[in-house]
Design a protein with these regions (language model features):
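Conserved Radical SAM active-site core
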Residues: 60-62, 69-216, 226-255
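Flexible glycine/acidic-rich beta-alpha junction loops that bind and position SAM and/or redox cofactors
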Residues: 196-197, 217-243, 263-286, 359-364, ...
Length: 469
């Protein structure tokens, strides 16, 4: 078999790799005489105190480098393909609820890529369906003990799962869960709930089946399907209402009691949307079992509130004058307004009203901040008094780039609105500091291997923490 040679795209300053004389454009050929298929092999082979690298320079010269380091110390090398060291595996399903299928045409190409790659599950926390994982893939996960693996279950009824994923192998793919469970590989799960499809009795069946995998399967989130206005020709799905949400929460809470008695964990978690839709208070912090499902919007609002309060406890407050405005999605707006009032108790002259942005681009049913476009911000904020600064969450932007989903740049929006725009990171401290301090431009710090809005498996989506600001 021909050895794969992996192009080095970046060498970090003051790293071991820089000391060795490695440069962008060099190619890694092998580690300890072993070929490197992808990032899994690389990370596994690098977990040694003594490693021998075979590197090919651009002129074809080969260097053999012996490196002594700490066991898990990184060399400081970044590779092409965002560090995956291989092509991305696209999704082989056609899920009835896939968000990418609900997007308008003519957006940037990377937004239409659907992943279903177990390696991204390990590296980034993306959720995978297991339908395109081979036995070899499972064996590698077990051999390298790569965990946690995040799985999009949707339904434990094999026939229904095949229907929902539009993949005749989707039911049989659940057998791979048994292999991971028997090997002790930690897992997290997700169910995208579709009204009249996998809710009610089907959800009950799924929760019962999934509970048997606890505590190796350490958590399962239940999230409502996201529906845009671009669903022509797709499976007819309906949004959940208040009564539906109350039933879902009652069902989940009953299972939480069962799992607490048996394992001491809540195990099943409802995303924040369900509580808002049902007009119920969010659970207490200890009910989230350490916030294992933040990326699915489980507990993000509670955590943000906790962090805001903790940050304010360490501040004495003063009479500084600050003006501005916060723009956020419909889902988070009432909570952000509440947090601003807490800040004003210590900083009474801070005037930062919250503006709820309606998602006209994707449709009013989309209420999360991370799917708001620059055009919607421009249209709905023009003419308003924005004060010294406009605060927006990093979730609105593409990873570590200052560009919105509709390709409007942060600079273009700032010029159109004639104001400084401050990017707020996801933590409560970040929110407090952004509110009480003068405008200071700070680029978003989040990074990702590749761009994705939200595929059928609702993996990490750019910087799309859906409840941040």
């Amino acid at each position: 078999m021909k050895l794969r040679k992996h192009m080095i795209s970046r060498v970090l300053p003051d790293s071991i790799a820089e000391e060795l004389g490695l440069e962008p454009g060099d190619r890694l050929v092998s580690v300890n005489g072993q070929p490197v298929e992808d990032v899994f092999d690389y990370r596994y082979l690098m977990n040694e105190e003594l490693v021998v690298l075979l590197v090919e320079k651009p002129d074809g010269e080969e260097w053999e480098l012996e490196v002594e380091k700490e066991y898990e110390e990184d060399l400081g090398i970044e590779f092409e393909n965002g560090g995956l060291m291989d092509d991305y595996r696209s999704c082989s399903n056609k899920c009835m609820f896939c968000f990418i299928d609900q997007m308008p045409p003519d957006m940037r190409e990377t937004l239409y890529f659907k992943d279903d790659d177990s390696r991204l599950s390990f590296l980034q926390g993306n959720y995978v369906t297991l339908t395109n994982m081979s036995e070899k893939d499972i064996e590698r996960v077990i051999r390298y003990h790569l965990e946690p693996i995040n799985i999009s279950f949707q339904a434990m009824n094999p026939e229904l799962r095949c229907k929902m994923l539009h993949n005749r192998f989707a039911g049989k793919a659940l057998e791979k869960v048994d292999m991971l469970y028997n090997a002790g590989i930690t897992m997290n799960g997700q169910i995208v709930l579709c009204k009249g499809v996998n809710d009610g009795d089907e959800l009950e069946y799924s929760l019962e089946k999934l509970s048997a995998y606890a505590p190796v399967l350490q958590s399962v989130s239940v999230v409502p399907v996201g529906l845009t206005k671009y669903r022509k020709g797709l499976y007819p799905l309906e949004p959940f209402n208040k009564e539906d949400a109350e039933k879902v929460l009652s069902q989940i809470q009953r299972w939480q009691k069962i799992m607490m008695e048996k394992y001491g964990i809540h195990f099943i978690h409802a995303s924040d949307e369900w509580y808002i839709l049902a007009d119920r208070e969010l659970p207490y912090e200890d009910e989230y079992d350490g916030y294992l499902q933040l990326e699915n919007g489980v507990g993000m609002l509670r955590l943000l509130e906790t962090e805001v309060k903790e940050t304010l406890e360490g501040l004495s407050g003063d009479d500084r004058k600050v003006t501005g405005r916060i723009a956020t999605g419909k889902l988070a707006a009432p909570f952000i307004t509440r947090y601003i009032k807490e800040i004003q108790k210590k900083y009474p002259n801070v005037q930062i009203p919250v503006t709820t942005i309606e998602n006209r681009f994707f449709g009013e049913k989309i209420t999360v901040s991370g799917l708001i476009t620059g055009q919607d911000l421009k249209e709905q904020l023009s003419g308003l008094d924005l004060g010294e600064k406009l605060l927006i969450p990093c979730s609105m932007l593409k990873g570590d780039e200052e560009i919105f989903l509709d390709d409007m740049t942060l600079k273009e929006l700032s010029e159109a609105l004639k104001t400084e725009i401050v990017i707020v990171d996801t933590g409560g401290r970040d929110l407090v500091e952004a509110v009480i301090n003068p405008p200071k431009h700070k680029p978003t710090r989040r990074r990702q291997i590749y761009e994705q809005t939200s595929s059928s498996d609702s993996g990490k989506a750019e910087c799309r923490q859906i409840h941040s600001v």
